[in-house]
Amino acid sequence: MIAAAASMSALGLGLGYLLGAAARKFHVETPPIVEEIAKILPGTNCGACGFPGCNGLAEAMAEGNAPVTACTPGGRDVALALAEIVTVEAGADAGPIAEIEPMVAFVFEDHCTGCQKCFKRCPTDAIVGGAKQIHTVVMDACIGCDACIEVCPTEAIVSRVKPKTLKTWYWDKPQPGLVAASAETAA
Amino acid sequence: MRLPSIATLFHPLQSFSIRGGIHPETHKHLTSECEIETMPMPALIRLPLQQHIGAEAEPIVKRDDLVLKGQLIAKARGPLSANIHAPTSGRVIAVGHFVAPHASGLPVPTITIRPDGEDKWGPHLPRLRPENAAPEEIAAQVAAAGIVGMGGATFPSAVKLNLRAKYDLTTLIINGAECEPYLTCDDRLMRERAEEIADGIGIMARALGVKQVFVAIESNKPQAIEAMTRYNRALGYTFKIHVVPTQYPMGSEKHLVKMITGQETPARALTADLGVVVHNIATAHAVHLAVRYGEPLIARTVTVSGHGIRRPANLRVLIGTPVSEIIAHCGGFTEEPDRLLLGGPMMGMPIQNPRVPVVKGTNGILALTAAETPEAKTMPCIRCGRCVQGCPVGLTPFELNARIHAGDLEGAAKVGLMDCLACGCCSYNCPANLPLVQSFQFAKGKLSERQSRKHQQEETKRLAAARKAREEAIAEAKKQMMLKRKAEMAAKKKAEEAAAAAAMPPPATATAIQGEATP
């Protein structure tokens, strides 16, 4: 009995020491760029980019496998901030950064069965509702990552452009050149 | 040292001036001789819940409720909000959404009332004797009546009347400049209701506890100046009638303060920092009605003008009257108007749908024909500087415009985009017809959108972190539970073993005893 315990402990300690030594010896330094990228990313681990969480994307981006525009919930601001620290080799020249309209999830209440699957999946707790009760989306908290759409068994959730309100509406950019051209052709 | 202008020789008070500004054709002759007439009862009344700056009011009526004139139907939500009252008696036929009286035409929460035609008053607000009332009581009465700034800014007036707690106020300026072309509703109100306005001014001066009161009127309204000079005292205050030059944008709060006191309000500061509060003429009138008669704000004076209107007029209309009914009352259009505006031609809102209602801040309805609207043909900017001369806040619009069109909004903000009043002097002055102020409106909206998205991103980050922490806590709790249960199981087993062990020996001893006993 004592011999067995002693041999197992000795084995454990020895292997543990070996593992520890190996970790020290073959330690791989995480490039600081990964951490910097991860800091800029929203950090919600929503998976909209197709990589395993924000850290996954940060690593892929540092290696040059993902464009700076990969984070859709982050939108233009995140892309611009990333383009500043991720240099050209990481794909900053992946075309002009498009202005992405912010999207939000919308629940069709007729189809919602109150299964709570979306509710559990939402990375920002933007979906509210109880079991067997119609769920709804808090628009200001929704990042449009579409995670809930994938899990909904009744396809009751769709992604929509975030509706404008009087507070968020603003005038379109005037196009003086176009006006001049049309006026001239009319004349 | 400041050199006095020649104008001071004629008007000793006029020793200050404002920067920039323009002198557009006023077109006020269209309606300046039209007496204020009362508009007949409209078929429908639509009251948006947001007719003021701040939080939306909260509806307290349901569909099919019967309401009386002056009844509270939506309650102010929070300190920066305003009550909304039923303008006439009738039935609430919907509490839903309707097109906003706004350039966007977006749907906004609206209460729709079908008037029963009896116009039956419900209980009035309790009357107040301002001579004996405390300033707080006056402000509370003004808040209860749902009065907001009626010059167009729609800032809740009661909040402004309560400023004495925070600022050392010395001066009240009553804004009767009405610098926007076409509009004459304030002019007519001063000419016809000077006594009531004077009383309202006195009440406001008392609530604010100021030392001096000025009434600023542009020099192109001689009859209004005369009327207000006749009624220049109330509640122990004597107002100084200050004739200001006819110049757009004289009616801007900060410019009026500069013109009268010579002090410039710092960027993004309030005039209250200088000890000055500015209220509109129409607001003074509404305050008079609210305090003396307990009447909430349910009607206002509106100028209906422009060459597209067959019979331009000044009307007293119920808040919530559809614009289309008002235009029909004024004889309809002479020709299909090029633009339909709410407010003045310089800063008003173009609307697409004429069924939108008049709200508390609507001072004009203008139907402008193609001849009255600016030419659309634009030419390149040659940096002539006319926009710089015209800008009343001293910006360089051509530079702002160039930066915005190059996509450098932050750079535009750095050179003062956020101080732009959107008065439109630059676009008016531009010989190349460039849409300068329109670009600034766009850029301001874009910047505030970016700001709010940034804010939202930070908030969602916080939410995600909170969720993660919660999930970890749950996992930890589960783990602890498992360990506890394991420990419990082990303890139970041990106890059982111990019990078994304890149970075993007695028979042995018993046999031993037996064995001992047998021999």
Swiss-Prot record, chain A:
RNA-binding is among the record's keywords: no
Coarse class of the protein's main subcellular location: membrane
Pfam family, one: FeS
UniProt cross-references to NCBIfam families, sorted A to Z: rnfB (TIGR01944)
HAMAP family associated with the record: RsxB_RnfB
Protein name, as recorded: Ion-translocating oxidoreductase complex subunit B
EC number: 7.-.-.-
Keyword list, A-Z: 4Fe-4S, Electron transport, Iron, Iron-sulfur, Membrane, Metal-binding, Nitrogen fixation, Repeat, Translocase, Transport
Gene Ontology BP terms: electron transport chain; nitrogen fixation
Cofactor: [4Fe-4S] cluster
InterPro entries: 4Fe-4S_dom (IPR007202), 4Fe4S_Fe-S-bd (IPR017896), 4Fe4S_Fe_S_CS (IPR017900), 4Fe4S_Ferredoxin_RnfB (IPR050395), Elect_transpt_cplx_RnfB/RsxB (IPR010207), RnfB/RsxB_Proteobac (IPR016463)
An MF annotation (GO) of this entry: 4 iron, 4 sulfur cluster binding
Note describing how the cofactor binds: Binds 3 [4Fe-4S] clusters.
Binding site for [4Fe-4S] cluster 3: C122, C142, C145, C148
Cellular component GO terms held in the UniProt record: plasma membrane; plasma membrane-derived chromatophore membrane
Subunit structure: The complex is composed of six subunits: RnfA, RnfB, RnfC, RnfD, RnfE and RnfG.
Induction of expression: Expression is reduced under iron-limiting conditions.
Protein family membership: Belongs to the 4Fe4S bacterial-type ferredoxin family. RnfB subfamily.
Residue ranges of the region described as Hydrophobic: 1-23
Organism: Rhodobacter capsulatus (Rhodopseudomonas capsulata)
Cellular compartments annotated: Cellular chromatophore membrane
UniProtKB/Swiss-Prot annotation, chain B:
GO MF annotation: an example: 4 iron, 4 sulfur cluster binding
Membrane topology: Peripheral membrane protein
Cofactor section: [4Fe-4S] cluster
Entry keyword annotation includes Transport: yes
Positions annotated to bind [4Fe-4S] cluster 1: C381, C384, C387, C430
Annotated binding of [4Fe-4S] cluster 2, by residue: C391, C420, C423, C426
One Gene Ontology term, aspect cellular component: plasma membrane-derived chromatophore membrane
Compartments where located: Cellular chromatophore membrane
Keyword Transmembrane among record annotations: no
Subunit structure: The complex is composed of six subunits: RnfA, RnfB, RnfC, RnfD, RnfE and RnfG.
NCBIfam families to which the protein is assigned, alphabetical: PRK05035.1, rnfC
Function: Part of a membrane-bound complex that couples electron transfer with translocation of ions across the membrane. Required for nitrogen fixation. Involved in electron transfer to nitrogenase.
Family affiliation: Belongs to the 4Fe4S bacterial-type ferredoxin family. RnfC subfamily.
HAMAP family: RsxC_RnfC
Protein name: Ion-translocating oxidoreductase complex subunit C
Source organism of the structure: Rhodobacter capsulatus (Rhodopseudomonas capsulata)
Record lineage: Bacteria, Pseudomonadati, Pseudomonadota, Alphaproteobacteria, Rhodobacterales
